[in-house]
């Protein structure tokens, strides 16, 4: 049993890494070309709509994907109930937002948002037809199939976006990119899952899941507000170009930290839920995931902080130079975001969606207070305050999970701090070794090679178990 779970977890991490890795590589490549063709204003306009699309998506899914994963043996009726509930809720939300579109355009002083938002909001309605299938794939840990589906959706949507941008469609190219991505994603989910909805509609299972899922719904909405509150505020109070520069920085930060968060998050909840009755084993597995997360996250995000200026100048050129300091600041908090993902999955796997909800309510209240206090001081000060708050709030999560799961702070510190300090020392050493280089192409290449070499050597010298296990797994060719 233990060996079976270990093997399943290892394979899940492998395909999760393949999924996240291919996703981020494609996003980076297509993102570079799109950023060269489009302006900060184009990204700013789409960025304003993000919070509305995501909140509507939260309402539409209503936390039932996680609820399905948490059920030991979900039935066809469970999936069917979730399917029809999601479709009906998303249709209602789309109608409401369709008529609210002129109000959104007026609030942000951007008349183009009326027609644009009505089109972009189609994405969450289309998405509702694949929520149950997504829950099925996650429950059955179909990580290989999830990787393939995401890959095809990314290729299709980005090619469409790139062609439209090349033909002068401006922000409409980003809108079409979003809609096509969701459409292809759903087609792939239907192709790989054997389950199909039927017209025997029974909302009984939804009612049973509601107590658990409603807390996730509230929390997901709060998470969305938390992650996008700065874009919303910037869109209201600052020029659209400033919003675009922040959106670009936030996108690159998210692309990087999502690689780690999605790699681990894809398997964390199903694995932890499967052993929730064995508290000691659950904590042992969680701490191993935590070490793996820290092992990847800190060097990746601190490394991006180090090379962000060269990266932006080389890839998307000088018109985006104003996004560099914002990206450098965001990457510091971005290093901790995958740890948030793990903490959240532990709370959900314990069936404590209330902990998940209240931790995030407190977080968004704190962020709103920061926004009210700091928005008068400019974008950079707001981003610094946001970063510090995100790091500090992790202590609140730790305190709650100590009570819920027995997760001790000293154990977490023992798992995280060595990787954080090694990554920070690596980047400081790399900076001083390479600071005399003037050519930005050479500087980017050398910094990447030097930092990777130093970090790898430190891990080998310290005989870090996570590294040895990763090497052994790759050698087995699985």
Roles of regions detected by a PLM:
Residues 5-64, 89-101, 123, 153-162, ...:
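Signature of the first transmembrane helix
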Residues 2, 402, 407-409, 431-478:
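Membrane-proximal transmembrane or re-entrant/amphipathic helices at the cytosolic face
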Residues 1-5, 9, 144, 187-228, ...:
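Interhelical loop/hinge segments that connect adjacent transmembrane helices in multipass membrane
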Residues 1-28, 66-69, 73-84, 113, ...:
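N-terminal membrane topogenesis motif
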Residues 27, 58-76, 138-139, 249, ...:
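Helix-loop junctions and terminal segments of transmembrane helices
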Residues 12-27, 174-177, 181, 185, ...:
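Transmembrane helical elements of multi-pass membrane transporters/channels
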Residues 114-121, 149-194, 208-212, 219, ...:
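Hydrophobic alpha-helical transmembrane segments
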Residues 6, 10, 67-76, 126-150, ...:
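Membrane-interface junctions at transmembrane-helix termini in multi-pass inner-membrane proteins
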